[in-house]
Amino acid sequence: MSLYDINGNEILTGGTGGSSQSELQRKFKDKDIVWIGDSIHAYTQPDGVTIPYLFQYNTGAKCYNWCQGGTTMALMDIANYDAFSGVGMVDCLTSRDFTNQETHMSDRGFTTQVAEMKAFDFSKADYVIIELGTNDNIKLVDLDNEDDPLDTHTTGGALRYMIKKLLTYNPKLNIAVCNIQDGVEGRRNEGLELVYVSKDRNEIIKSVCDKLNIPLIDIFYLLGLNDYTSSTLLSDGLHRTHEGKLKQAKVIERQMNYYF
């Protein structure tokens, strides 16, 4: 079966990168997988598809892509972003109270997704894949708070909070967390060249996952982003080209197949 983008052009899916499609489908076909993340998994540019869509195409899983551009793991006290942050998303999905999301869904362009979230029985989810932290870097969110490990205004505290909430809601839920890539020189934040300290934030993400025995999908290394590959994998110094989406989907497929 061929896959086509929004312009009717055939899309090459690039296979499954070492995991046979039949093996992936035996494991993930018809499984409900919720994706909580940022624009890296939300954007359809430039090819009309997303990374979760490619994962669904290769595995037969039912992927619910509730990723939102610009969102952080942590809260930032900005109402229309916090509603769709990692913390905000987990709160509404586990409490079934979507008041904050409904308040801000129009100005964030998330009306369809909120309707889908409300209609979905989250207790039936098989997996949650968390892909957040890049915007925590860009927006200079604090890494962690030694005095309060559940400080939801830090990346580490927010991730602990999310995992705690999800597993308290459903102890059988399978969770995987993606770490983050390096940025590319030249992206700017408030007129200043952005120093992308992915290593420090990834250490916090890894520490939380290690402590809680949550599988970590190592995007930082396995995507293979460097000075020689950035023009192939990235369209704007951050978001993925079609080739970059194919590779990231393969990485996630392989890692999910390994862990689960």
Functional labels for PLM-detected ranges:
Residues E131-I138, I163-D200:
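Active-site segments of SGNH/GDSL-like serine hydrolases
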Residues D32, I40-P149:
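Conserved SGNH/GDSL esterase-like catalytic core that processes O-acyl groups on lipids
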Residues R26-I33:
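A short, charged/proline- and glycine-enriched loop
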Residues I51, E116, T155-M162, R201-I205, ...:
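A general structural detector for well-ordered alpha-helical segments in enzyme core domains, enriched
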Residues I78-F84, I180-F260:
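Catalytic His-Asp segment of secreted/periplasmic serine-dependent ester chemistry enzymes
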Residues M1-S22:
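Short, low-complexity N-terminal tether/leader segments at secretion or assembly junctions of large
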Residues I36-G37, C178:
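Short hydrophobic segments within beta-strands
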